[in-house]
């Protein structure tokens, strides 16, 4: 905030974790800095909870610009603040040369509003190419030029894309599909939660159960597992909420705000005997 104010920064790139930490600052601290020079704040790297983004737009104005895509293909979708306020939660419409398509598990296109696997048709025919990994490149395609980045989502009637989770992150507990992102977006709004990641861990009875790994903020060291589970249940259907919460100090986020959930899951599965 000091740099934005002192140097009259006009554009910058952030991830949602930055927004959460900025909003956690006391209002008196935030109000000390002039951020009126900002014209564009691009955010990417991770999903941004609706409440967090709304609060940032109220504070900084309609300068947030969200980009969704991958290093291997660039930006596939984008959305301005003005568009987002009309389509809250969306990552935007597909941008040329891409077209967004939702498929079911059998590879058939689904109707607008129906959740499924998010794919993009690259009208250049290139698709996604992972460096020195032809097998991964091939596995990402359902047909030539039509690829997925691994997300689950849906399209609204106006063609805006909404992402609900990732294929690989989905937890199957007692035959029910649970999307960790739903719990994450609730828990991150708790005043004592600085960061969170939900993962599937082994459960002999249910196959998997949802575990939330939580970083508490410095003022929330006394918040308990029971309090956070109760908070989640107050805001989400019970079966979608974590069965257990562990408090940790680091989620291993990259500089782009991404978390390697496979790495987080590994210790729980290594010695599990089903």
Question: Where are each of the predicted segments found?
Answer:
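Gly/Ser/Thr-rich phosphate-binding loop
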Residues: 1-4, 9-14, 23-87, 99, ...
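AMP-binding/adenylate-forming catalytic core of the ANL superfamily
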Residues: 4-5, 12-15, 109, 121-122, ...
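Glycine-centered tight turns that cap/initiate beta-strands
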Residues: 37, 61, 97, 192-195, ...
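Hydrophobic/anchoring residues in structured secondary elements
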Residues: 40-43, 198, 246-247
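Active-site glycine-centered loops adjacent to acidic/histidine catalytic or metal-binding residues
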Residues: 45, 69, 92, 151, ...
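Adenylate-forming AMP-binding core of the ANL superfamily, especially NRPS adenylation
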Residues: 47, 86-132, 140
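Acidic/polar alpha-helix N-cap and adjacent early helical turns
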Residues: 267-274
């Amino acid at each position: 905030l000091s740099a934005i104010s002192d140097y009259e920064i006009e554009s910058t790139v952030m991830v949602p974790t930055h927004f959460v930490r900025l909003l956690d600052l006391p209002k008196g601290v935030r109000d000390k800095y002039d951020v009126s020079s900002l014209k564009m704040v691009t955010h990417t790297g991770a999903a941004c909870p609706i409440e967090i983004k709304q609060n940032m737009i109220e504070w900084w104005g309609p300068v947030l610009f969200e980009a969704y895509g991958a290093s291997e293909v660039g930006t596939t979708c984008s959305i301005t603040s003005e568009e987002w306020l009309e389509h809250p939660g969306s990552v935007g419409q597909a941008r040329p040369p891409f077209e967004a398509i939702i498929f079911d598990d059998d590879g058939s296109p689904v109707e607008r509003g129906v959740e499924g696997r998010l794919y993009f048709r690259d009208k250049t025919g290139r698709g996604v190419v992972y460096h020195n990994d032809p097998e991964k490149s091939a596995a990402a395609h359902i047909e030539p030029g039509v690829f997925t980045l691994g997300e689950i989502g849906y399209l609204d009637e106006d063609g805006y894309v909404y992402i609900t989770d990732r294929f690989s992150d989905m937890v199957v507990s007692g035959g029910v599909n649970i999307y960790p992102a739903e719990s994450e977006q609730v828990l991150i709004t708790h005043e004592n939660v600085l960061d969170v990641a939900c993962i599937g861990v082994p459960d002999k009875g249910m196959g998997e159960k949802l575990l939330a790994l939580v970083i508490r903020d410095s003022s929330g060291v006394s918040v308990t597992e029971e309090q956070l589970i109760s908070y989640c249940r107050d805001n989400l259907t019970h079966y979608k909420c974590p069965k257990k919460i562990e408090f940790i100090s680091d989620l291993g986020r990259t500089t782009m705000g991404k978390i390697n959930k496979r790495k987080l899951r590994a210790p729980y599965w290594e010695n599990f005997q089903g």
